[in-house]
Design a protein with these regions (language model features):
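C-terminal regulatory/interaction module of P-loop NTP-utilizing enzymes
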Residues: 1-148
Length: 148
């Protein structure tokens, strides 16, 4: 018999709770997990996205040169995007990694072309190039409402 160390812990991510993805959004990456394997875990915790202000604080921590003006617009964009996603109007999620990339892009260019142009280019490069075509009109509408 192998006895585990008293402080031994294991954690695993199962983005779909092991049930796979019925939406088709993650068809290549999220598969149905073995029920036998899933039964070995006795605690499941659903972790939602962090609140938009927290996420933007994370972006500001990692991209300290990002202007307040750009950060405020990114916060408004993220808040509205996540609401659209939660309400089912948008099917493509936006992650903290996306926002960090957007913040880095905007910060790199806003000193040369201004924050408004940097945001427009950043949104086009980081967000619009990666969303589902069906989401584009809704996401573009959000961007149009919050950007100068």
């Amino acid at each position: 018999m192998v006895e585990p160390h008293p402080q031994f812990r294991i954690m695993a991510a199962a983005n779909s709770g092991g049930s796979g993805d019925s939406s088709g959004l993650y068809s290549a990456a999220v598969k149905v997990q073995s029920r036998a394997a899933m039964n070995r875990y006795n605690v499941f915790v659903r972790v939602n996205y962090m609140e938009a202000p927290e996420e933007m604080a994370l972006v500001r921590k990692h991209v300290p040169d990002l202007s307040d003006a750009a950060s405020d617009i990114m916060l408004a964009f993220l808040t509205n995007y996540r609401k659209g996603f939660a309400d089912g109007e948008i099917t493509t999620p936006i992650s903290p990694r996306n926002m960090l990339t957007l913040g880095s892009y905007v910060s790199a260019f806003e000193g040369r072309i201004g924050y408004a142009s940097a945001l427009e280019r950043g949104l086009n490069t980081v967000i619009f190039q990666s969303i589902d075509d069906n989401d584009a009109p809704v996401v573009r509408g959000i961007a149009d409402r919050v950007t100068p």
